[in-house]
UniProtKB/Swiss-Prot annotation:
SUPFAM superfamilies: Thiolase-like. This is 3-oxoacyl-[acyl-carrier-protein] synthase, mitochondrial. Belongs to the thiolase-like superfamily. Beta-ketoacyl-ACP synthases family. Pfam families: ketoacyl-synt, Ketoacyl-synt_C. May play a role in the biosynthesis of lipoic acid as well as longer chain fatty acids required for optimal mitochondrial function. It comes from Bos taurus (Bovine). Its main location: mitochondrion. Pathway: Lipid metabolism; fatty acid biosynthesis. Inhibited by cerulenin.
Length: 460
C-alpha cells in the first residue's frame, strides 16, 4: 500500500502530465498561435481598420473629410481654473449626441465608467470603431488567440491622482476608490479592449511620451511581421487636459501663448510659439496581408518599415541639429528596403515649437538632400492640436488614409515661412498626391526624453 505522501505526489505528477500533453496538443493543432513566417522571411502587414476619436470628431471618413477640408478642432479654454495659466486654447474631443460627437455611453455602460479613466473609455471607443471598420470580430478561440492588442497611453489624467490624494488626506483610507489603481495604469486601455473583445494574443502597452502611439503601431507591425499575431489592434490614447497638466507643460515653456484658437497651432510658421494640447484616441487594425486577402478585407495601406532612435541629449528639447530624427527616419527607410528617393510624402511630427520644427526640417533635408524639394511635408497638428500619446497613431491613420485617397492633408495657418523652410509643406489647402510609382510616406513622432519613431507606410 502506497504511503499518503507518495499518493499525493503521483496525483500532482499526473495532473502536470495531463496539462503538458494538453498544451502540446494545442500547440500541434496551432490553435493558439499565429501563422509563423518562413525562416528568414518577414510577413507583409496591412492596415484594414481605423477608428478615430479626435478633436475633429469621431469616426474615420468624417474625421478625414474635415481634415482635408482644413477644419480645426482647437477651441478656447473656458473656466476660472485656467485664468492663471498662460495658455488659453486646447483641442477637445467634441461631446454630445450629434454626428461626429463623442458620447461615451454609446461604447461603455455608465456603470462601468467609474472604474475607468477618460483615455481608457476613448480607447475602447476607437478600438470598437476600428474593428467594425475592419470587419474583424473574431469568434473562434483560434482567431481570438491570434489577435492581440497594443494601445499606449502617454500619461494618466493627473486629476485622477490629485483628487484621490486630496480625498485620502481629508477623508481617509475608506474613501479611496478600489478602482483608483486600475484607473491610473497605462496598460488598462489594452486590457479593457482585450477583455471586451476576447482578444488573447499579445497584450502590450507603450508609454513613451509623444511617441507612444507610433511605438504602439510600430511594435504591433513587428508582432504581425514576425508571426506573434495575425492581427493587432494598435494605437494610442490620451485625455489629460486639466489645469494641472496645462500648468506643467506651460512651466516647461512647451505650450503656445497665442489666444486665437484658429491660429495658435501653426507648424513651420515663423511665429510659432508652442504646441496646443489635445486629447483623443486612435486605433488601427494591423493584419497579415494574406490573412486580410483571404477574408476579403478592404486594405487602406501597408506598413513597410519602422525606425527608432534616441537623442540622448535633453529631457524635453530635441537635438537642435535633428540627428535623432535623421537616424530614426533613415532606420525606417532601411527597414522598408527602399531608397529615400522613393518617399514622396512625410507626415511631420512638427508640433509648432520653435526648436522642434526646425530640428525636423533639418533632419528631412539631411536625409533626402535634393529630393527634399520634390517630396511633400505636412503637419496635421494645426487641425487636431498635439494629441500627445495619441498623436503617432492618429497621424499613422492620416498617412494611411492619404495613401488610400491619394490626397495630402494640409498644414493649417502656414501663410508664410522663413528662408530655410523652403519645402512643400502643403500650406493651407490639401493637395492631390501625385506619384509616378507607389505612394510611399513616412510619419514621424518624437517625444520628451529624446524618444523617436518613424513609420514607413505605402499605398497598395
Amino acid at each position: 500500500m502506497l504511503s499518503d505522501g507518495l499518493q499525493i505526489f503521483l496525483r500532482i505528477t499526473k495532473c502536470h502530465l495531463i496539462h503538458a500533453r494538453s498544451c502540446q496538443r494545442l500547440v500541434n493543432e496551432r490553435r493558439f498561435l499565429a501563422t509563423a513566417p518562413a525562416p528568414g522571411l518577414r510577413r507583409r502587414v496591412v492596415i484594414t481598420g481605423i477608428g478615430l476619436v479626435t478633436p475633429l470628431g469621431v469616426g474615420t471618413q468624417l474625421v478625414w473629410d474635415r481634415l482635408v477640408r482644413g477644419e480645426s478642432g482647437i477651441v478656447s479654454l473656458v473656466g476660472d481654473e485656467y485664468q492663471s495659466i498662460p495658455c488659453s486654447v486646447a483641442a477637445y474631443v467634441p461631446r454630445g449626441c450629434d454626428e461626429g460627437q463623442f458620447n461615451e455611453q454609446n461604447f461603455v455602460p455608465k456603470s462601468d465608467t467609474k472604474s475607468m479613466s477618460p483615455p481608457t473609455v476613448m480607447a475602447i471607443a476607437a478600438a470598437e470603431l476600428a474593428l467594425k471598420d475592419a470587419g474583424w470580430h473574431p469568434q473562434s478561440e483560434a482567431d481570438q488567440a491570434a489577435t492581440g492588442v497594443a494601445i499606449g497611453m502617454g500619461m494618466v489624467p493627473l486629476e485622477v491622482i490629485s483628487e484621490t490624494a486630496l480625498t485620502f488626506q481629508t477623508k481617509g483610507y475608506s474613501k479611496v476608490s478600489p478602482f483608483f489603481v486600475p484607473k491610473i495604469l497605462v496598460n488598462m486601455a489594452s486590457g479593457q479592449v482585450s477583455i471586451r473583445h476576447k482578444l488573447k494574443g499579445p497584450n502590450h502597452a507603450v508609454s513613451t511620451a509623444c511617441t507612444t502611439g507610433a511605438h504602439a503601431v510600430g511594435d504591433s507591425f513587428r508582432f504581425v511581421a514576425h508571426g506573434d499575431a495575425d492581427v493587432m489592434v494598435a494605437g494610442g490614447t490620451d485625455s489629460c487636459i486639466s489645469p494641472l497638466s496645462l500648468a506643467g507643460f506651460a512651466r516647461a515653456r512647451a505650450l503656445s501663448t497665442n489666444t486665437d484658437p484658429k491660429s495658435a497651432c501653426r507648424p513651420f510658421h515663423p511665429q510659432r510659439d508652442g504646441f496646443v494640447m489635445g486629447e483623443g484616441a486612435a486605433v488601427l487594425v494591423l493584419e497579415e496581408h494574406r490573412h486580410a486577402l483571404r477574408r476579403g478585407a478592404r486594405v487602406y495601406a501597408e506598413i513597410v518599415g519602422y525606425g527608432l532612435s534616441g537623442d540622448a541629449g535633453h529631457i524635453t528639447a530635441p537635438d537642435p541639429g535633428g540627428e535623432g530624427a535623421f537616424r530614426c527616419m533613415a532606420a525606417a527607410v532601411k527597414d522598408a528596403g527602399i531608397q529615400p528617393e522613393e518617399v514622396s510624402y512625410i507626415n511631420a511630427h512638427a508640433t509648432s515649437t520653435p526648436l522642434g520644427d526646425a530640428a525636423e526640417n533639418k533632419a528631412i533635408k539631411q536625409l533626402f538632400k535634393d529630393h527634399a524639394h520634390v517630396l511633400a511635408v505636412s503637419s496635421t497638428k494645426g487641425a487636431t492640436g498635439h494629441l500627445l500619446g495619441t498623436a503617432g497613431a492618429a497621424e499613422a491613420a492620416f498617412t494611411a488614409l492619404a495613401c488610400y485617397h491619394r490626397k495630402l492633408p494640409p498644414t493649417l495657418n502656414l501663410d508664410c515661412t522663413e528662408p530655410h523652410f523652403d519645402l512643400n509643406y502643403v500650406p493651407l489647402k490639401a493637395q492631390e498626391w501625385k506619384a509616378e510609382n507607389r505612394r510611399i510616406a513616412l510619419t514621424n513622432s518624437f517625444g520628451f526624453g529624446g524618444t523617436n519613431a518613424t513609420l514607413c507606410i505605402a499605398g497598395m
